[in-house]
């Protein structure tokens, strides 16, 4: 019985390269067979070859030519994934989408991964979504969240061409994620690229307005969620205790909790300041491993 599942990474930029190192760093059920880009001179492809991974500038066509690849991590762009999704589905390959395209259902590992392990396309929302939606969900499972707002500040140096092309998709998809997964009646997302040098760590301010909530229960739920995310993103942490207040909000005067979150990257390929990219690749690996394990179990019982 096969104990691994062959996977490929589509996109050889910062995110694709960091994901490659994460998969190679701890080999379990994912067998990285290929990394495919479109630029023959890509640093990511050169690094893949140096690690003994088959690298090609043939893009999605190269991946589709290999029937043994069962899972594809798409680390390109939202517009590109809209084209890739249909072709991957037709080829019977599971797509784990690291762009804001949102063709498949939104997935945040500690919140709803197990609900979607059987889907042929899952979407990891955005870096800001992976960072802040768990906290909004932590409040919504013990209170009625009327409004959630997040401001994500990331180092400008960590935002490559793909990130910059996806700014509009980022705000829309993250806002929807705060609602659909986080449980807020209304969500709002803002991203800021900070050019400071040395680069700052990813910082997120999360503002949650709620009804029918107990401070102690909310604090406990948030603490448990922080612990859950740290299992795959060790650098995920609050900068201080939750701040409770009562304020005027877009939904009227309500109780609010304000959270200051910092994400430090693991430094597998990207600098530790690129926590915004690290949380995406760590989440992708987590999702890929769970889906791969299910595929193995299905094969063993067939």
Swiss-Prot record:
Keywords: Aromatic hydrocarbons catabolism, NAD, Oxidoreductase. GO terms for molecular function: acetaldehyde dehydrogenase (acetylating) activity; NAD binding. The keyword NAD applies. InterPro entries: Acetaldehyde_dehydrogenase, Acetylaldehyde_DH_C, NAD(P)-bd_dom_sf, Semialdehyde_DH_NAD-bd. It comes from the Bacteria. SMART domains: Semialdhyde_dh. GO terms for biological process: catabolic process. This is Acetaldehyde dehydrogenase. It comes from Geobacillus genomosp. 3.
């Amino acid at each position: 019985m096969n104990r691994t599942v062959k996977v490929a990474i589509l996109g050889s930029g910062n995110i694709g390269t960091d994901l490659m190192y994460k998969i190679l760093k701890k080999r379990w059920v994912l067998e990285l067979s290929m990394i495919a880009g479109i630029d023959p001179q890509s640093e990511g492809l050169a690094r893949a070859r140096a690690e003994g991974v088959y690298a090609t500038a043939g893009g999605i066509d190269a991946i589709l030519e290999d029937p043994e690849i069962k899972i594809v991590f798409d680390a390109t762009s939202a517009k590109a994934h809209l084209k890739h999704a249909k072709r991957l589905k037709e080829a019977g390959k599971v797509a784990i989408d690291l762009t804001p395209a949102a063709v498949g259902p939104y997935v945040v590992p500690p919140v709803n991964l197990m609900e979607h392990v059987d889907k042929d396309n899952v979407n990891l929302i955005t870096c800001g979504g992976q960072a802040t939606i768990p906290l909004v969900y932590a409040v919504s499972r013990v209170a009625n969240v009327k409004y959630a707002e997040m401001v994500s500040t990331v180092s400008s140096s960590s935002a490559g061409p793909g990130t910059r092309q996806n700014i509009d998709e980022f705000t829309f998809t993250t806002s929807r994620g705060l609602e659909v997964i986080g449980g807020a009646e209304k969500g709002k997302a803002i991203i800021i690229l900070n050019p400071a040098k040395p680069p700052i760590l990813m910082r997120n301010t999360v503002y949650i307005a709620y009804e029918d909530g107990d401070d102690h229960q909310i604090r406990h739920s948030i603490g448990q969620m922080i612990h859950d995310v740290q299992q795959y993103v060790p650098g995920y942490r609050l900068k201080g205790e939750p701040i409770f207040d009562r304020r005027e909000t877009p939904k009227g005067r309500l109780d609010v909790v304000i959270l200051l979150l910092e994400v430090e990257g693991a430094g597998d390929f990207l600098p530790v300041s690129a926590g915004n990219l690290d949380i995406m690749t760590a989440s992708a690996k987590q999702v890929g491993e769970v889906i791969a394990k299910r595929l193995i179990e299905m094969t063993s019982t067939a």
